[in-house]
């Protein structure tokens, strides 16, 4: 790999780690703090809506955690030179994160800001890693 490629890979791994950390945070919000007064405004839910959707949010939170774990394991794999397996895991994790953000944007345009926050770091990770692995 070229020096430029290695720099792109390093930057991509940083963005993948940020995406993973964000999804761990979302996991905590959805699975444990869903009905909390400070959490509800972030998701645009009333007390009644939050209570009614608590079980769904709990499960969705774990989905986000699993995406974060897949991505984190991929990062570790790349760092210990299991590059092919690590890249596959990172692309699966961040690709799913990005696609989920796109689905959110398309189906709930009023949640555009959340979709952008959710999708930016995975997108940057995917772009940088793709370029880095090519170089």
Model-assigned labels for residue ranges:
Residues 60-73, 121-122:
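Core segments of transmembrane alpha-helices
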Residues 7-10, 48-51, 55-58, 81-88, ...:
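Juxtamembrane loop-transmembrane helix junctions in multi-pass integral membrane proteins
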Residues 9-33:
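N-terminal signal-anchor transmembrane alpha helix
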Residues 73-120:
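Transmembrane helix-loop-helix
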Residues 31-39, 79-83, 109-113, 133-134:
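Transmembrane helix-loop junctions in multipass membrane proteins, especially transporters and channels
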Residues 1-7:
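Short, Lys/Arg-enriched N-terminal segments with co-localized hydrophobic residues
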Residues 126-135:
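Juxtamembrane boundary at the C-terminal end of a transmembrane helix
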Residues 31-54:
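Cytosolic, membrane-interface loops and tails of multi-pass inner-membrane proteins
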């Amino acid at each position: 790999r070229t020096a430029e490629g290695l720099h792109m890979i390093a930057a991509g791994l940083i963005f993948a780690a940020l995406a993973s950390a964000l999804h761990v945070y979302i996991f905590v919000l959805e699975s444990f703090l869903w009905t909390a007064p400070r959490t509800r405004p972030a998701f645009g839910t009333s007390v009644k809506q939050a209570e009614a959707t608590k079980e769904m949010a709990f499960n969705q939170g774990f989905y986000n955690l699993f995406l974060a774990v897949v991505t984190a394991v991929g990062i570790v794999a790349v760092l210990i030179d299991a590059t092919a397996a690590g890249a596959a895991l990172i692309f699966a994790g961040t690709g799913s994160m990005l696609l989920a953000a796109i689905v959110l944007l398309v189906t709930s345009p009023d949640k555009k800001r959340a979709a952008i926050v959710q999708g930016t770091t995975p997108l940057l990770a995917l772009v940088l890693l793709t370029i880095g692995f090519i170089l």
